[in-house]
C-alpha cells in the first residue's frame, strides 16, 4: 500500500531509498492511522510531530496497529498543525519502529491471537526526509493510501485511467536498478 503512495507523493530521494526496500520484500510495514477515542474519524488524531532540528519528535498513541510488534516500519498520520479545520495540519511520515520511544503492545484477542497492537510514542524520532509530501498535507496522502488499500494495484498499473500504462516490474526496475 505504501509503495504506490510513495511513487505518487514521494520525492526522488525517497523513491530511490524506500522503494527498493519494499521491492526486495525487506521489512514489514504497519499502518498508524487509528487512535483511541476517535472511532472511524481518522482526522480526529491527537498524535503530534513537533520539529526538533532536522527531525520531528512524535508523541501519542495509535490503536489497532496490525502487526505493529513485528513491523520494522510504520506509515503514520500525525498532527503537525492546527486542529481546526481537522483535515488540515496533518502530515504523513514513515517511521522506523526499532527505536527508543516506540512501544507496540499486542492486544490479546478473545481468539487467543494478538495480530493487533496499541502503539505508544514518546519522543520517537522521524527525520524530516521521512515526511512524504509537504508539511500539513498528509490528509491527502493518507486518503490516497486508503484508496490503494481498497483497490489493490490497479491505480499503480493504470495511473487511474483504467488502461495499462506500466507494470509493477517496470516500476521496480526503475527504482531498484535491476533489468532482469
Task: For the regions a language model picked out, list residue spans one by one.
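Glycine-rich beta->alpha junctions and the first turn(s) of the following alpha-helix
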Residues: 102-180
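A short, Trp-centered hydrophobic/proline-enriched beta-strand micro-motif
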Residues: 25-33, 77
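A structural signal for short hydrophobic beta-strand segments in well-ordered beta-sheet cores
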Residues: 47-50
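Short Gly/Pro-enriched turn/cap motifs at secondary-structure boundaries
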Residues: 37-40, 64-67, 82-84, 108-115
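Structural signature of FAD isoalloxazine-binding scaffolds in flavoprotein oxidoreductases
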Residues: 41-45
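N-terminal glycine-rich flavin-associated loop
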Residues: 1-13, 39
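A short core secondary-structure module
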Residues: 55, 59-105
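Short loop segments at secondary-structure junctions
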Residues: 9-11, 52-54, 79-83, 97-100, ...
Amino acid at each position: 500500500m505504501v509503495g504506490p503512495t510513495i511513487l505518487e507523493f514521494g520525492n526522488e530521494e525517497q523513491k530511490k531509498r524506500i522503494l527498493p526496500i519494499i521491492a526486495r520484500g525487506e521489512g514489514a510495514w504497519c499502518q498508524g492511522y487509528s487512535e483511541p477515542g476517535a472511532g472511524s474519524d481518522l482526522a480526529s488524531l491527537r498524535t503530534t510531530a513537533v520539529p526538533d532540528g532536522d527531525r520531528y519528535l512524535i508523541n501519542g498513541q495509535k490503536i489497532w496497529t496490525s502487526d505493529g510488534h513485528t513491523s520494522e516500519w510504520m506509515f503514520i498520520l500525525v498532527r503537525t498543525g492546527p486542529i481546526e479545520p481537522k483535515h488540515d495540519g496533518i502530515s504523513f511520515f514513515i517511521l522506523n519502529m526499532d527505536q527508543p520511544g516506540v512501544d507496540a503492545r499486542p492486544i490479546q484477542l478473545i481468539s487467543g491471537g494478538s495480530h493487533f497492537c496499541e502503539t505508544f510514542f514518546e519522543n520517537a524520532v522521524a527525520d524530516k526526509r521521512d515526511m512524504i509530501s509537504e508539511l500539513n498535507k498528509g490528509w491527502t496522502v493518507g486518503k490516497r493510501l486508503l484508496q490503494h488499500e481498497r483497490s489493490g494495484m490497479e491505480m499503480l498499473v493504470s495511473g487511474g485511467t483504467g488502461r495499462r500504462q506500466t507494470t509493477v516490474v517496470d516500476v521496480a526496475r526503475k527504482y531498484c536498478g535491476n533489468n532482469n
